[in-house]
Amino acid sequence: MNKLKETIRMIEELDQETMQKARERVDNLIKPPKSLGRLEDLAVQLAGITKTIHPTVANKAIIVMAADHGVYEEGIAGFPQEITVVQTLNFVKGVTGVCALGKVSGTKIIPVDIGVKEDLDPNAGVLIRKIKYGTDNMAKGPAMSREEAIRALEVGIEVANEEIKNGVTLLGTGEMGIGNTTASTAILSVLGNFDPKEITGRGAGLSPEGIQRKAAVIKRAIEVNQPDATDGIDVVAKVGGLEIAGMAGVMLAAAANRIPVVVDGYIATAAALIAVSLEPKTKQYLIPSHASAEIGSIKATELLGIKPMIHMDLCLGEGSGAALVFPIVEAACHMINCMPTFEEAGITI
């Protein structure tokens, strides 16, 4: 708990003076005002995060948290639970979606076993930080204890801190865990006061009947556990997931270290809701990636108050959307660093 508290204490507001200078520079680059749209806003945000009008994000990593979910036994997923461990090992082989997309920007993919149901070979290349062998069935009781949730948050903090110590300047969040759209929808239902029926989607290939069953399970989990919407730790402990808490920890660590962090899709946005509930200033360090095809995604991004960068009907997870947006973040840096102002170019208008 001390690590979590200290991390939260370190999170500061963005540097407004640097942002003002960055805005003035962007407004005077050799182009019509606002002609590069949200790329200009992103450059200003990066300046405020890094305290320089010449931000760089050369060293990039996506931390992929992997864990299983006890609620799987309620029939809420369209794929076998074994996919979690198979895909977790595939991250090491470099053959998953996020690995392929990450190659575009030279991004390091870091898979972390924070709660996979099976034991993984410690020499396989996955970072072993297992809290427990998957969550408990939240339809019958808490997904995990409060202490386990705090520990999962702190695992995310520790992994992110290590990568930042090693020189990473841009982080992304990813996940792997069959059943985690159920946990994410439960979190969103609690924090946004939504009826699960309104925001429950197909996840990994559910039928219409399966979606109805999933919504009913989520409603039952909330009724059984009565999570406190004003306490993010209580919410993620009772109806969340280990990988969701881990991603929230990554976001908190990024903010504490003044490192931009790209939020992937629906599950990562649920993690962002937890992180921001623990420290609202964390939101200023988040860079949204894509509008997920998952039905609750729009509600989640609206509740968080972020606007996705791209709309491509993605719903893979893994950090795949973050990987696609990394080049956009780099482009924002190149724009403010490589384009001259009218004065620098000797142009009078």
Swiss-Prot record:
* Keywords carried by this UniProt record: Cobalamin biosynthesis, Glycosyltransferase, Transferase
Recorded hits in NCBIfam families, A to Z, give: cobT_DBIPRT, PRK00105.1
Q: In which pathway does it act?
A: Nucleoside biosynthesis; alpha-ribazole biosynthesis; alpha-ribazole from 5,6-dimethylbenzimidazole: step 1/2
Active site, UniProt feature:
E318 (proton acceptor)
Q: What is this protein called?
A: Nicotinate-nucleotide--dimethylbenzimidazole phosphoribosyltransferase
In short, the EC number is 2.4.2.21
Q: Give the organism the record lists.
A: Alkaliphilus metalliredigens (strain QYMF)
MF terms from GO for this chain are: nicotinate-nucleotide-dimethylbenzimidazole phosphoribosyltransferase activity
Task: State the family it belongs to.
Answer: Belongs to the CobT family.
Membrane-crossing segments per the record = none
Q: Which PANTHER family match?
A: NICOTINATE-NUCLEOTIDE--DIMETHYLBENZIMIDAZOLE PHOSPHORIBOSYLTRANSFERASE
Q: Which gene name belongs to this protein? A: cobT
Entries under Pfam families matching the protein: DBI_PRT
Catalysed conversion reaction? 5,6-dimethylbenzimidazole + nicotinate beta-D-ribonucleotide = alpha-ribazole 5'-phosphate + nicotinate + H(+)
GO BP, one example?
A: cobalamin biosynthetic process
Q: What class of enzyme is it?
A: transferase
State the function annotated in the UniProt record.
Catalyzes the synthesis of alpha-ribazole-5'-phosphate from nicotinate mononucleotide (NAMN) and 5,6-dimethylbenzimidazole (DMB).
